């Protein structure tokens, strides 16, 4: 995994970065999702909305690069939407580095012919010049993709909130009304009994007992208020969230279509106007279905309110309680119609639902739109007699008109949403395929074979290490090759522009003596192997070293290696003539070697068998990990030395207490040797942590 940010500057890019996004002027701000629903919706809550807007306002392109097995590599713009899929790179990916000018991608892979054989580490440089050549266009397209991806997530979470609002009343409906229907023992239908109560004002003794003992007046009132509140919440979510999100999605897709029609700029990137038009049509169908749901909610609310008001008054009269004057009034014909419609819709026999919701209680009209199922609506809207539908059926020209969005009267809102997501994904997948196919292999170098002893070490900590010098536009690769029991550090560098070359493309670095003579042996006989190396910044490499002869009292060293001591102005060394039929370790004798003396830029790592290092030059921090992966030390680098402060937290485990040789002992006399370094160059261990890293 690798994250990069474009740093290239040009007049075209500067004008693009400074240009204001018109969507901020033309589109209303998306309302925040309610916090009382799903926790996943909190990303669009009031507290998080500013962070989302900040992300969408970041015009400078940054990308997340992911690599997997079988040479599968993906590039995600802003870490959200895929803009390139690269295939065909041999081996399993172990390292990635996309140059900040987008001209090339460095890849380290591990190729293993069979399960028992040694793996071969190979370096590839992939040409990604299409991204670099069309950087303004890629950036604008990626911004649109990010907007569209964010809006799809916003719509999905809005629908999730609607479903949760509906589930609140669905549980109450099931536990009360369905139970009431199932326990009915009379031969007449529930619908007939309620109709008798509606028309004659009298209920059967059984219906009266069930209403008064199970449902109760108080329970009915509470149920009615809960249902009305949930209806209002769903209605508000449709109007303020689904519709606003869909309209914004339609706007950005329309802009994307306009970009696709500018073939000179965007055709090479794979934007397809016809595919985007299909996506626009799918969004239109979703908007139509959302509007249909609004009409159903409005109709159902009227029926529900009328039914519960009527039943509430009827139950008050059954219990001989006082009926308020505003409730004790003659029902109008419209009220009777609403109640009759409710009874017809919800207490009508539906044999296909016997095993799902109760034998005589039909699925609620609003809830069927929110079900994430492929089945058709149980109660689709009645379009008979609708003049517009009749006009469309009789018009041969309008039936296939691209100006009209398709309408799916038999499908739920969830179904239409999934169809919209599928069409949009297909539409936006093509650029990733086209850009991925444009990426081709420019360089392939077999470096070395891994030793069997390294198999148990997590690959996360293993060299090689990749780095991109954003100023000089150079790719670096750090790795070690064991030669005569000493691990030299090799520095491979290549220009990000695959058509250009750099001097000293491959060099080996060995470390001469730099420790004080007071450490046991003579300085002339001491050699150091490189255990791990990471770039601290563009000019410095942080390394972990050990003496080649492992003995008790031989300490590991954390040091800073300036590249200026490796690449000097008077370099006239002969360049390696690469033999592509051999691995690099088979040609190591022909590689120029630099012997480096680090002077004051080092520190002895006392009482720790250090093996791995990770650094951050921006934060000026280095982190050292022990060889058994159990102990960590954190160092502050390049700080003023106001007096060394050390905080040690000794981990007391049974293994260490038993004398496990994970940590080396250092005499107190040797501690003074650390203090001879420069105050600005010496790593200052201001904080040290030793903790167990076992899972």
Residue locations for each model-derived region?
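Canonical WD40 repeat/beta-propeller blade segments in eukaryotic WD-repeat proteins
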Residues: 1-56, 92-97, 525-533, 604-613
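Loop/turn segments within WD40 beta-propeller blades
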Residues: 54-61, 98-102, 536-538, 615-618
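Surface-exposed loop/turn positions within WD40 beta-propeller blades
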Residues: 61, 68-72, 486, 629
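Residue-level signature of beta-propeller blades and closely related beta-rich strand-turn architectures
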Residues: 70, 79, 111, 547-549
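C-terminal scaffolding/assembly regions of large eukaryotic complex subunits
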Residues: 113-695
